[in-house]
Amino acid sequence: MKIASINVNGIREAVELGFLDWLAEQDADVVCVQNLKAKSFELDDTILYPEGYEGYFLDAEQDGFSGVGLYCRKIPKAIMYGLGFEQCDNEGRFLQADYDRFSVATFLMPSGDDDPAAKQTFMTQYLEYLNKMARKRREYIICGTWHIAHKTLDLANWADNQTTP
């Protein structure tokens, strides 16, 4: 199975810049998409259901903000929208497709730029979910935008990010 992941930073602009061509070129079974910045009900069918894919989306309540999506060639057995805690679900940050023996999820971590405490709370709640996942007899593939840098090399301006979680 081939899985791809991309942060589009706005699905409409990404489509204008060639996202649908990129999607076709990937020939992936599942494509995880983050930062849609659009309500799915406002999108054209060419974006919702590109040729050969079924699209699934979790919108943020706030217009023009976050949102995640999955493009799947094979229809999943189940789709899980959100994680059951307000910040994640209202901001459209987690979407999971369940297949027979594994699950594929797309994930968008808050950046923490405006509210580091909210990001820390989110990470604590997300860790609880990851611990639950670890106890299940299932394989997970989580793709996404984590907004976490492992090393200073991973940051464009590491000195300015020393106080951001």
Enumerate the language-model features and the residues they cover.
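Surface-exposed cleft-lining segments at the edges of enzyme active sites
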Residues: 84-85, 108-124, 159-164
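Metal-dependent phosphoesterases centered on the DNase I-like endonuclease/exonuclease/phosphatase
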Residues: 51-54, 125-165
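Active-site-proximal beta-strand elements of phosphoester/diester hydrolases
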Residues: 1-9, 101-113, 143
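Short amphipathic alpha-helices and their capping/turn segments at secondary-structure boundaries
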Residues: 20-24, 93-100, 125-138
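N-terminal, active-site-proximal structural segment of metallo-dependent hydrolase catalytic domains
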Residues: 1-49, 54, 60-66, 81
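Soluble or luminal CAZymes and related metallo-dependent hydrolases
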Residues: 11-15, 89, 118-126
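Short catalytic/ligand-binding loop motif for oxyanion handling, primarily in non-cytosolic enzymes
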Residues: 12, 40-42, 64-65, 112-114, ...
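Structured beta-strand-rich core segments of catalytic domains in phosphoester-bond hydrolases
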Residues: 37, 44-110
